[in-house]
């Protein structure tokens, strides 16, 4: 793959946003907004309708107004030096155009500037204005956990408004406000990232296969066409943005276990050698330099933020581990039947996977893969990423795990009626503990999840070339992070070598989980699992996890 084709993997709508709620497997993958807010301060001498940005300029939705007092000094950055009492319309429009490179924080559509204190599109600006101009009483029909993205933003007004408020949209922000230096730097980082994408896009091949695959509709197109021919709720995956829930998958457990394992595309014989796929490379040296220079640092920073926004906060985890154990909750879980514990674990895993889907959307280029490949990667990789995420919830010194809102001794979690189930649970905790002992940073955990999800040659995917390019990009960033933060573990064996060597274990545990689920369903056919869990781990659509 040449430089031009590689860029087609990246959309102009990246990076996306956080989503704290839960829904089902397809809509979340098309949500592409960012979680940061722009907190705004009231200033007494600013005209109505004028918003000061952090660099002393006045921006309105339609024109540029002169300020009545000079800004407190001047600021220089990627937008250039700005000072003095007045700014001409041409200069303000130029800066607004640069901000508009960043997608709408609410739904991921093309933004039109800063509205109500947040970078949004015209559609979300108008929605928020209407919600604030009259008394509204929105109701959510789906547990207040709907995904708000370009496809589904009009389906639930309640969740859309909550997301606007969570991002920091405010009527006060229309009139007054300044971004802090930290917020300004975030915006500048985003603009740099999208400019790097645009530079690569200018050189993109006109016959790229992605040109015909995904076209981003404008705000007006979506606003007028949302309810015409919408596919509805065909499956749990449909609420994450997927029509028809992906390709039919008909292999079964017996065929998976009977198939010989394909040769793994990794080598550890010489751990001083950087990872290279066995097939020819798809990035030339010049483009690798551009990626590392223009994108890699922003990728690390952005993925770390999205990782933090789709996981329990470290402060909360540490607080829970520092509290005395809640005896009543311990007794409650100890009194659970085998069946109750199975279903409770399925609920907890489903909630985690909902956030994993949110995170996957934020991996640059993931949303440019075909819909079928996105679904296949999630079906085959979501359980593996759950193991990685579990490592954050384990205290390896005390042998404890944060399970929901209670800290449990790990030894209490590995008791099972069937020795095979016990081996599964024990294997999961051992894998998670081994990751926790490496003391990865949040950035490294985020990149590691990207590597696990995008591991090349997963069975059934069609876009292996594109997936491999995305994998290489995450690998490059991960290598830089590990080299900067970790010394070799033993001899020339690095932390990265160790992490890559764990991925086959994740595959084995995924298969063991499917086997345990199969046995449980045979003995308890009437128990109902969460829809997303049933869809991802249905034995009617099992993937060959052992391939690749």
Curated annotation (Swiss-Prot):
One GO MF term: nuclear receptor activity
Keywords, comma-separated and alphabetical: DNA-binding, Metal-binding, Nucleus, Receptor, Transcription, Transcription regulation, Zinc, Zinc-finger
CDD domains, per database record: NR_DBD_ROR
The UniProt record lists the keyword Membrane: no
Region described as Disordered: spans on this chain: 1-27, 198-228
Residues of the NR LBD domain: 295-539
GO cellular component terms given for this protein: nucleus
Functional description taken from the UniProt entry: Putative receptor whose ligand is not yet known.
Family listed: Belongs to the nuclear hormone receptor family. NR1 subfamily.
Protein name, UniProt field: Probable nuclear hormone receptor HR3
Gene source species: Manduca sexta
